[in-house]
Amino acid sequence: MTALPRRIGMLGGTFDPVHIGHLRGALEVAELLELDELRLTPSARPPHRDMPSVTAEDRLAMVQSAVAGVSPLTVDDRELKRDKPSYTLDTLESMRAELAPRDQLFLLLGWDAFCGLPTWHRWEELLEHCHIVVLQRPDADSESPDAMRNLLAARAVSDPKALKGPGGQITFVWQTPLSVSATQIRQLLASGKSVRFLVPDAVLAYIDARGLYRAPNTDGSS
């Protein structure tokens, strides 16, 4: 009997720190697409963003604590093991090599990241390895950049559940709007305010135990 193709998702990010917006969005997509596994993949040296505020080890530990016991969410640390920029194409190629030919691989991207794809390393090759699932918010600008219009005309599928084959198509998934950002959380922590209910309790405990994101003490006291 032929085994059914596996359905694997990837959500990359700095996760600096991971928060409920990341996690709720990931879980919604995993359930909608009936994924066997959705891998949260922390990036080490993101080419298109500032360097993270805390170490890779801390960011990885926070993501691991956030998804512990939450199926089908898992953590993939391969980008943290590379001594070079975290190019998504390299990660997809590596993941694809581990899967069976018929297995489906889904790359989850936020709207802003999707619109910025033309600036990514060898971005035209991404769809050779995966489907792209764009996480869309009701308040987002829905006008796609000119560079993406021909691609969308050729590859877009309106029903996320209708994606066929191991890769090559693009679809959009509407997200529950949660106005939470890692920047906001870092600012709250730096000002001494609580971020309870913006991050999982296990992540908050980790942040508190290590004093992450706190403003440095400048008053001369120990």
From Swiss-Prot:
Its EC number is 2.7.7.18. One of its GO terms (biological process) is NAD biosynthetic process. GO terms for molecular function: ATP binding; nicotinate-nucleotide adenylyltransferase activity. Keywords: ATP-binding, NAD, Nucleotide-binding, Nucleotidyltransferase, Pyridine nucleotide biosynthesis, Transferase. InterPro entries: Cyt_trans-like, NadD/NMNAT, Rossmann-like_a/b/a_fold. Pathway: Cofactor biosynthesis; NAD(+) biosynthesis; deamido-NAD(+) from nicotinate D-ribonucleotide: step 1/1. Pfam families: CTP_transf_like. It catalyses: nicotinate beta-D-ribonucleotide + ATP + H(+) = deamido-NAD(+) + diphosphate. Catalyzes the reversible adenylation of nicotinate mononucleotide (NaMN) to nicotinic acid adenine dinucleotide (NaAD). Belongs to the NadD family. This is Probable nicotinate-nucleotide adenylyltransferase. It comes from Pseudomonas syringae pv. syringae (strain B728a).
